[in-house]
């Protein structure tokens, strides 16, 4: 309803160009499950898989066919990208979302292998320290929660997003 949207706008200090009504239940989730701290000291167990994973319609077409998020996160992302589109930013896409423990383990090991090739004299601890500057061990990644996305509008993840018009709008 209009009253609910107005109350939300007042609470968050923002007004929106899109009609937020269909998204309000998703962007104001009160379930503690959506307030989960995941990092190097608060790990997810290896068998943790969110039950409500759903495909994101905003997946970048140069990687996996689909990216998944928890339902509320997917709907909140949909609202965010709809609002971005109202400001002319239509090219931001999801490059990574949910990752299983096993997939995060695979990625971390691939990154370690790549760094070993680049730094053949480095110890395992040094290699791990390098990789930990841009990736995390399995269980430590917010991606496993299904609540996290990586996204950008660049042809390569090696280019800085920070100076783009989209990043300035986001800030």
Feature locations, PLM:
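Extracytoplasmic cell-surface/polysaccharide-interacting catalytic and binding patches
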Residues: 1-97, 101-171
């Amino acid at each position: 309803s209009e009253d609910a949207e107005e109350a939300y706008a007042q609470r968050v200090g923002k007004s929106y160009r899109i009609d937020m009504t269909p998204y309000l239940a998703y962007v104001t989730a009160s379930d503690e499950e959506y307030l989960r701290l995941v990092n190097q000291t608060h790990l997810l167990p290896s068998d943790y898989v969110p039950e409500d994973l759903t495909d994101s319609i905003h997946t970048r077409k140069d990687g996996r066919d689909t990216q998944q998020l928890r339902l509320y996160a997917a709907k909140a992302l949909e609202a965010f990208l709809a609002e971005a589109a109202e400001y002319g930013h239509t090219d931001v896409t999801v490059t990574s979302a949910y990752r299983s423990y096993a997939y995060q383990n695979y990625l971390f090991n691939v990154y370690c292998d790549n760094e070993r090739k680049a730094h053949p004299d480095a110890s395992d601890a040094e290699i791990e320290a390098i990789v930990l500057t841009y990736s995390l061990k399995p269980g430590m990644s917010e991606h496993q929660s299904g609540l996290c996305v990586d996204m950008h509008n660049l042809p390569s993840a090696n280019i800085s997003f920070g100076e783009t018009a989209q990043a300035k709008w986001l800030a």
